[in-house]
Amino acid sequence: MDGETPAQKAARLAAAAAALAAKTAADAAAKAAAIAAAAA
């Protein structure tokens, strides 16, 4: 990533953080669904 501007670096980090947050939320939703199914 040579020659990357600070703005490009910040945008890439923000995209990575958003992807991680989305994965975490999806994992939590799947876990909650599994618990609800087991309780039903």
From Swiss-Prot:
This protein's UniProt keywords: Antifreeze protein, Repeat
Blocked amino end (Met) PTM positions read: M1
| Repeat as UniProt keyword | yes
Q: Which domain of life is it from?
A: Eukaryota
UniProt record similarity statement: Belongs to the type-I AFP family.
What's this chain's function?
Antifreeze proteins lower the blood freezing point.
Q: What is the protein's given name? A: Ice-structuring protein GS-8
